[in-house]
């Protein structure tokens, strides 16, 4: 059982192809099946501060050195896979118009400083060490997942589709924008000042210490622990903003 083999819904033989910025769709008969014979290549990441993962890439990410990525894939997919650096950004995914199935797509990534991270398509990114710094931007869509610890001054987090942030650690301030059925699983994340906007059927759980400003629409739910001063609390539909007493 390899983590890279399932489609977004766990269906065998599912495949993703690129269809515009950040978008993936099931595709047709000209897809390439992974051979099962794995190859790896190393990419220099000097100066890279942004990582964008797509398709079904499984990424282990940490900060430190040396700044490089080791990308592992089936040996017959090298022409289908995008693993390249442009400016300060590493992009991992499938080339536009290409399609793969039963593929192993893995990357071990080390950057000196992380400012932006995106998990698109069905990618999964795990942070192996706390991300530090003044500001960190996280984006996730599709069924993308970002998991791990943060320790930053400001956290800007945006998620859509059925994506998941599973975060721990702390941030002095956080702005969260969630749509679709996305989730913020942050029972071990503490934010001093949170501004959250949720719509659709989103779920968010987070610790808030000083101030909370929140808007929830649709059937979304924000659960917070702590006793912050509430500066905005707007709900509509059957959405809710509730203090978690557990």
Positions of PLM-derived features:
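Extended, compositionally simple hydrophobic/Ser/Thr-rich segments
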Residues: 40-43, 49-61, 89, 105-245
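Short acidic/polar N-terminal linker immediately downstream of export determinants
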Residues: 1-80, 89-110, 126-127, 239-246
């Amino acid at each position: 059982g390899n983590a890279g083999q399932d489609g977004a819904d766990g269906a065998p033989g599912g495949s993703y192809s690129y269809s515009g910025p950040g978008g993936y769709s099931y595709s047709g008969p000209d897809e390439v099946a992974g051979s099962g014979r794995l190859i790896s290549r190393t990419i220099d990441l000097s100066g890279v501060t942004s990582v964008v993962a797509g398709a079904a890439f499984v990424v282990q990410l940490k900060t430190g050195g040396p700044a490089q990525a080791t990308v592992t894939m089936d040996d017959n997919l090298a022409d289908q896979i995008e693993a390249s650096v442009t400016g300060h950004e590493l992009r991992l995914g499938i080339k536009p118009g290409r399609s793969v199935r039963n593929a192993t797509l893995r990357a071990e990534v080390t950057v000196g400083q992380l400012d932006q991270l995106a998990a698109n398509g069905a990618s999964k990114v795990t942070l192996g060490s706390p991300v530090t710094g003044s500001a960190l931007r996280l984006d996730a869509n599709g069924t993308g997942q970002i998991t791990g610890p943060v320790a930053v001054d400001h956290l800007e987090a945006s998620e859509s589709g059925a994506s998941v942030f599973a975060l721990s650690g702390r941030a002095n301030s956080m702005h969260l924008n969630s749509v679709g059925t996305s989730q913020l699983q942050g029972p071990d994340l503490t934010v001093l000042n949170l501004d959250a906007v949720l719509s659709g059927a989103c779920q968010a759980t987070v610790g808030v210490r000083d101030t909370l400003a929140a808007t929830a629409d649709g059937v979304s739910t924000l659960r917070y622990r702590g006793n912050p001063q509430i500066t905005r609390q707007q709900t509509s539909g059957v959405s809710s903003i509730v203090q978690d007493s557990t």
